[in-house]
Amino acid sequence: MGSSLNKPLSDRVEDINNQSSMIYDPWRHRGDVNSTYHSSSSVTHRRRNHRLSPLEKQKMKNIQSLNFSVNDNLLQREEYEKTTKGLHLKKTFGKWIICLFLGVIVGCIAYVIKMVVQLLQGLKFHYTNHYVSNGLQGEAFLTFLGINLLFVFLSCLMVIVAGPLASSSGIPEVKGILNGVKVREALGFRALLGKIVSLVLSFSSGLFVGPEGPMIHIGSAVGAAISQFKSSTMGFYPSLFLSYRNDRDKRDFISIGAATGLAAAFGAPIGGVLFSIEEVSSFWSRQLTWRTFFTCVIAAFTTNFLLQGIGSSPDMHDTGLLTFGFSRLYLFRYSELLCFCFLGLIGGLLGAFFVFLNIHLNKWRKEKLKQNPYLRLFEALFVSVVTSVVCYYASFIFDCRYQSNIVIETSVCEDQSNTEMVQFFCPDGMYSELGSLLFGNPDQALRRLYSRTNNMFTLPPLLVFTLISLFFSIWSSGLWVAGGLFVPMMMVGAGFGRLFGQTISMWFTNIDSSIYALVGSAAMMAGYCRMTVCIVVIMVELTEGTQYLVPIILAVMISKWVGDFFNESVYEHLMEQKSIPFLQSKPPHSTNNIRISDVMSKNVVVLPEVCQVRLLVNILNSNNHNAFPVINSGPYDNQRLYRGIILRDHILVLLFYRVFYRGTGEEIYLDENFDFDKFTTETSKSPPPLSEMNFDQFELDSFIDLRPYMNSSGVTIHNTFSFVEAYKLFRNMGLRHLPVIDINNEVVGMVTRNDLF
């Protein structure tokens, strides 16, 4: 082989261009049924019998990834040298200030949502009860139905206007983003506004939805917005937040926002932190724990202060969108622990059943209804009609009971007003059992189910309520309205928990059914979402007492084990249905015998360190790859020695601002007018398309020195690596691209996130 060191730079560039003319296909190994890769499970989920379909793979291929790794280039290193201790403290202090504002804003949003929901629900029941008190059954139903339909119509209409990302809980999208997936517009202003308005209306409409999931999405969107503080539409890019405009810092603030949203929804700051750690965040640090806890406390305090601190009552113990009071009474005996374990078993079975039906229902919606706004609107209105009819007329099924028969001993919620029942069409002094559970808001229903008395409800109404709640929770999940699942699942769990508690109290005296309702709620939540520590802490924070800790822990752990035996959590299935390429913490066992050379793309497009503009334009026009290894020709022909990696967006910025020169390439060329601040500012924006750049012949013959801008510390692996170890690098370091080199440091392949599925 002849030496290439003495060739002119233009000839060496042409040689590299010819060597790299073939564009790698990141899916070339997926179509070969005989390949080692295809013979194993191609998905990171735990179910052994699942494989991604070609359509699912293609959808995942079209989804881009985020850049969590630091771009350690020459500009960045020079900036590090200029950074003093004072500037570092300023950036750190700025993060705490952002957290403070994030907590206050999310707390204010939670307060506004609760106040508006109370207003709308109050108006609905005010007009409905006007006809109920006059014995006008038909008029009362039509009023009840009409208002519910109006709220659902407006809620669904808001989703149609704002986009599908404003519907449901938004947790799958948040999990995907925090895992490294770029879900476009999921945290944009339109999705945020649509989510808030749709949530207020859907939660007021009587549908079996809750506020906690959307609040997590809302908190994440606020965290993303306030940390970036920019507007591409208005061309607003203040330099004050420049150092935070990167995917890594944005990811941290989204994690904080997700925790803050839950903390504001439940008034549970510790539960919010644990939720972000256990469920949504894929990357965590000790510093992030401190900031998340601080922000959650600020959000919970802000909501609480606005709800109670401004008013006449000085009490500050009852917080959140959902509040259940507190008790210091010890309400169970250790001989009942076996019964609590049984509740965990039932919660796991019902949770797995819920996930199973939810999967198939959403699959049917995806195939039949698609994204058709008219069909989606019709479905939401139809579900509202059926829900209103059942909740209204089910209250007539059972006979009325005398209010005087209820003996209030005490309650999980000590506020005695929580046990006030709904009279509905019953005579004075009597109440409707199902009406007290179905004809009202979920907060009141849960308070009544948690009340400490065994003669408030009889067994048949509790059974009917549990079945109705489960059925409509399944049906309402996935509608084109904003709504979560925590509260509906708590209602289902409280229903079967109290039913079980009152059943065994027929044979064993001194059984407190209220604690069974509480434990049942925790078991049902763990059964469908498979969280453990987070749920235990949330339930303890809701009741403001640790006396329920042992039974809740038992029920939650058993419920998770039972549910995991049948399927995964509902959020993982939803991510799969939405084709969000989520990397689990560990690869499937079936990939243990796969090498990285089996999945890597071997014909890689590479760039020289000093690249001609003409070559760059041709390469960018001929493919849509998002990163290119940068090489330096070795002493022999065809050698491609790895030097670094550069992103497509960064190349577009360099081309747009004409960072050109016509030197020999012997010295590193650094444009003084394109410093670190300029480079960071421009790369934080959406890059201009190549089609809008017009170059003359002089510019096309010029060169760009990529060395100051490429990431020279990018992670690489040898072609002898196993798939499992490469997977761990992607998962633990938040990588987007991973060049593969041989023993001579030559680029022989490329692996992306999409190659892991």
From Swiss-Prot:
Q: Please give the residue ranges for the topological domain Cytoplasmic.
A: 1-96
Q: Where along the sequence do coiled-coil regions lie? A: none
Name the residues that span the membrane.
Answer: 97-117, 141-161, 196-216, 253-273, 292-312, 337-357, 378-398, 462-482, 484-504, 506-526, 535-555
Localization: Membrane
Q: What residue stretches are annotated with the CBS domain?
A: 600-667, 710-757
Offer one Pfam family short name for this entry. Answer: CBS
InterPro entries the record matches: CBS_dom (IPR000644), CBS_dom_sf (IPR046342), Cl-channel/antiporter (IPR051280), Cl-channel_core (IPR014743), ClC (IPR001807)
| Main location class | membrane
Q: Name one GO molecular function term.
A: chloride transmembrane transporter activity
Classify the source by domain of life: Eukaryota
Q: Which UniProt keywords apply?
A: CBS domain, Chloride, Chloride channel, Ion channel, Ion transport, Membrane, Repeat, Transmembrane, Transmembrane helix, Transport, Voltage-gated channel
The answer on whether this UniProt entry bears the keyword Ion transport reads yes
Specify the protein's topology with respect to the membrane. Answer: Multi-pass membrane protein
A cellular component annotation (GO) from this entry = chloride channel complex
Homology family:
Belongs to the chloride channel (TC 2.A.49) family.
- State the protein's purpose: Voltage-gated chloride channel. Chloride channels may have several functions including the regulation of cell volume, membrane potential stabilization and signal transduction.
Q: What is this protein called?
A: Chloride channel protein C
UniProt source species: Dictyostelium discoideum (Social amoeba)
Q: What is the lineage of its organism?
A: Eukaryota, Amoebozoa, Evosea, Eumycetozoa, Dictyostelia
